[in-house]
């Protein structure tokens, strides 16, 4: 075997990169030899914005050192939780069932107060033709234009209301929503839209928003679809599929060589829908996290 430099596959560790493609403008990302530190000093409680992404799956006896590193680089800025992420590859034809974790890593993580959970990252292979049948109007939401209360601002507000259905379908579920967190997330999307890195799409039925999603990208050819939400009364009508297809197709028109990804819980509806649209499993991202501090 040659002793020359190893050439990495272009898509190595692309699963974690997909999860970072839509980070907010106030999130700091720094690269080290064995990890990528993601920090959001203004929101130390934000899980996706305060995490240590490892460049390789850790051995059981390495976890404690990474937890210490998290404390030094992220916890010192106020994060009350610990979160480590790493990825393991999946075959494109891998089943939707969750991958099996390394039992020794899980045991050691538990001893450190961390729970390990999987997330499937899928990448677009070939976009399947639209299924049709969704009786909705699909429309991109314009970037904010600086006119509070104007038509564009009202469009953003209308799509934001749909976030309540992430928590559940009933008013009791909605009362548990963290409205401040949703407002902050939407404001970050608005800022990304202003600089051309986020496109929100809405599905309208009789002029009313019944579905929405966000497609964000990093300006370097990697895009991620997030926050696909459909009103409970309008589900199982092909709206989510229609939204996904339109958003991805539109992005590929602007950047034909883009890699488009989506993260979903293994075997979930989002996982199965992505596969039907032509996205294929790429990696399992393992998330080892502690409970939030009281």
Give the label of every model feature segment.
Residues 44-52, 217-226, 235:
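A conserved beta-turn-beta hairpin within the catalytic core of GNAT-like acetyltransferases
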Residues 29-33, 97-115, 197-213:
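Conserved beta-hairpin
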Residues 1-77, 81, 90-102:
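N-terminal charged segments
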Residues 22-28, 78-80, 117-118, 190-202, ...:
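A short helix-loop-beta-strand connector motif used in the catalytic cores of GNAT acetyltransferases and
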Residues 63-71, 227-232, 236-253, 276:
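Conserved acetyl-CoA-binding loop-helix of GNAT-fold acetyltransferases
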Residues 134-223:
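Flexible, substrate/cofactor-facing loop regions flanked by secondary structure
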Residues 56, 62-161, 261, 268-270, ...:
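Acyl-donor-binding surface of acyltransferase catalytic domains
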Residues 34-40, 117-119, 200-202, 208-217, ...:
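Conserved beta-strand in the GNAT
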């Amino acid at each position: 075997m040659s002793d020359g430099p190893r050439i990495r596959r272009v898509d190595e560790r692309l699963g974690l990169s997909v999860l970072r493609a839509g980070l907010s403008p106030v999130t700091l990302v720094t690269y080290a030899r064995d990890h990528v530190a993601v920090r959001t000093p203004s929101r130390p409680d934000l899980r996706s914005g305060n995490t240590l992404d490892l460049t390789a799956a850790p051995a059981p006896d390495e976890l404690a050192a990474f937890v210490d590193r998290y404390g030094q680089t992220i916890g010192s800025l106020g994060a009350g939780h610990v979160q480590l992420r790493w990825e393991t590859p999946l075959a494109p034809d891998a089943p939707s069932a969750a991958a099996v974790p390394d039992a020794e890593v899980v045991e050691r993580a538990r001893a450190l107060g961390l729970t390990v959970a999987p997330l499937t990252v899928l990448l677009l292979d070939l976009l399947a033709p639209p299924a049709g049948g969704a009786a909705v109007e699909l429309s991109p939401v314009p970037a904010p234009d600086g006119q509070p209360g104007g038509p564009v601002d009202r469009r953003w507000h209308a799509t934001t209301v749909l976030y309540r259905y992430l928590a559940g379908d009933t008013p009791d579920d909605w009362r548990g929503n963290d409205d401040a967190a949703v407002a902050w997330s939407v404001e970050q999307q608005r800022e990304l839209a202003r600089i051309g890195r986020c496109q929100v799409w809405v599905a309208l039925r009789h002029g009313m928003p019944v579905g929405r999603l966000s497609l964000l990208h990093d300006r370097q050819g990697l895009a991620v679809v997030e926050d696909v939400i459909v009103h409970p009364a309008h589900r199982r009508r092909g709206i989510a599929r229609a939204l996904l297809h339109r958003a991805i197709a539109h992005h590929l028109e602007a950047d034909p060589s883009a890699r488009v990804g989506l993260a979903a819980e293994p075997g979930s509806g989002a996982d199965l829908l992505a596969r039907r649209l032509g996205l294929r499993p790429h990696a399992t991202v393992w998330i080892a996290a502690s409970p939030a501090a009281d």
